[in-house]
Amino acid sequence: SECLVGSEMCIRDRFFSSLCAWMIARRKSRGMKVLYFLFVAAMLIPFQVIMYPLISILEKVSLKNLVGLIILYTGFGISMSVFMMTGYIKSVPKDIEESAVIDGANILQVFFYIMIPLIKPMIITIIILNGMWIWNDYLLPFLVLGTSDLKTLTLEIYYVKMTAGQYGSPWETLFPSVLIAILPLIVIFLLFQKHFVKGVTAGAVKS
């Protein structure tokens, strides 16, 4: 369940957030400024404030399942993704895109063949950050999935602890579970460490 939720969220969020950030960074209009402000403002709203209304809505539309969890993660993650990608795209020279247009590329070709390769470090950075958030999150899966058969890894570890009772702790089961939980994050970080560091430090020093 954890892999399904994380992969679905990362694919959808990366596509929509990168496309939206590209439009915000390149289209100098009042509407784009307002849209950018709304994304930034959404980051300031604590989850606890909107927690109960969201769960109530999901229950009414019968989405207290993995699909509803993916939708919520995508909605919560897109604000930070747009914010980070907008700043990164602004550091990319616009002349590269204009040269592609002169060579006959349309707007979709410019986005997929020019922008996506250029912003790959930031895309990988956001995937790792959001992946860590989803992998370690407990509250949202607990509220959405509850006691359903499809549980995330954090919920499984929690229920392993609860099966031992109030004063029991099955350490022989908990320790291997926690180790298995952190190994994928370590492997992913080691594989994409170069891109992650490049994405985090982007824009820190002016050239």
Predicted segments with their positions:
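A structural signal for multi-pass alpha-helical bundles of membrane permease subunits
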Residues: 1, 5-8, 12-207
